[in-house]
Amino acid sequence: MRHFFKLGLVSAAVLGSQMTLANDFWSQDRQWLLGDWGGERQQLEKQGYKFTASIMSQAATNLDGGYNDSNTLENAGQLTLGANFDLSKIAGWEDTTAAIMITKRDGNSLTLERIKDPRSTTLGNTQEIYGRGKIWRLTQAWVKKGFNDNTVQFKIGRMGMSDDFNSSQCEFQNLLLCGGQLGKSIGSIWYNWPVGLWGTNVKYQFAPEWTLGLGVYEVNPDNVKTQSNSDGFNLDMNNVKGATIPVELAWKPKLAMFNGLPGEYKVGALYSTADANDVGTVSKVHDSKHSFWINTQQQLTQHNDNAKRGLFVSFNGVVNDKATTMVESTQQLALWYKGPFDSRPNDSIGFGLANYVVNKRVRDRQIATNESRGYYEYDDLASNYVPIQHDELNVELNYTYQWSPAVMLRPNIQYIHQPAGVKEVDDAWVAGLSMRLNF
């Protein structure tokens, strides 16, 4: 709660100060709450320097159900500070860009506090912005160079893996409905935002609609430590356990069956050389693990002559290595309509469903562990009872109120079936509110 009120006070102070500084503060065309710095900001962008600063807040309250139905409100937040550099303008390096991004997360998760059995391994989360510690992190520090009219692009530095592979839209507050799926099921080797890690990748656009990507990223547990802020700026590779190698094929057609509207279809696979524990057999270790994925997004309709308005759909799926991964697969289906009203062309309405499928080998091991301790049915009180995990379904309905490019509000209703995959935990209803402020 205190983080929620802190964010509210800061936001109110900023908003109030801007009302006195700019007559056009309430304009729906306003790009940044701190304004254009008297024209300097756009001038810097023309020279190759683009600066970003934003606050994202995600509040959630339990309406009914869950492991603990005592009502509470939890808020998670993130501060992002970044800069992008067009080095062709700054230094004359043709087709070269660079970026640096620092993030700070804070707050608490309603899922951990109320929704799931605290003895069970977490699957989903009602606030996608929560996780990876309440510390400062160097999230990005990379350089990208284009060759052959940018049909070949080479990138190296510190980055998140889903920046370039298994990426997807994020029109929702629920974790599994936001962005790529791999980090939600194999987080021990696939590090998503806000974690940065050493890596490199190359993308080759071998035809106008087709691109092939290949990457190599370190598997380093030090990158996900959360004890202190220094953990978020760890740059050494002393504890590297191996490498994760993703490959992805992307197709961006404008199909006649969708009236020539744009779509994107991606298939990918990864191979990790790091040792991985077997999920069903104690002390058994594998020398690798693998996963496969599909990402699809398609615009289905267009509103009159405005290409940005209309109905969009996405489907994302992941299949993981059964020998080494607790979550066998995930599926996500989402629909959103941009510009539902002529008076609100930048708003959207979204509805999505996402599912975790827990590996049967994990479930068998949980059952065997409980039976060895004398438990043959769910025990709500025993601290050494291991909840048996099945599937978890997440559903969200939301409305995105885009007042301006600088201010976004997203009220939402979420439904969680079998929180953390535990059948004995009541299905939960949650009300949420996301807010983003761009400064």
Swiss-Prot record:
Record carries keyword Plastid: no
GO CC terms of this entry: cell outer membrane; pore complex
InterPro entries referenced in this protein's UniProt entry, alphabetically: Carb-sel_porin_OprB (IPR007049), OprB_Porin (IPR052932), OprB_sf (IPR038673)
Species this protein is from: Acinetobacter baylyi (strain ATCC 33305 / BD413 / ADP1)
GO biological process terms on file: carbohydrate transport; monoatomic ion transport
Protein name as catalogued: Putative porin QuiX
Coarse class of the protein's main subcellular location: membrane
Annotated signal peptide: 1-22
Localization in the cell: Cell outer membrane
Native organism taxonomy: Bacteria, Pseudomonadati, Pseudomonadota, Gammaproteobacteria, Moraxellales
Pfam families per the UniProt record, alphabetical: OprB (PF04966)
Family: Belongs to the OprB family.
Topology within the bilayer: Multi-pass membrane protein
Name of encoding gene: quiX
PANTHER family per UniProt: PORIN B
Keywords associated with the record: Cell outer membrane, Ion transport, Membrane, Porin, Signal, Transmembrane, Transmembrane beta strand, Transport
Superkingdom of the source species: Bacteria
GO molecular function (one): porin activity
Role, per record: Could be involved in the transport of quinate or shikimate.
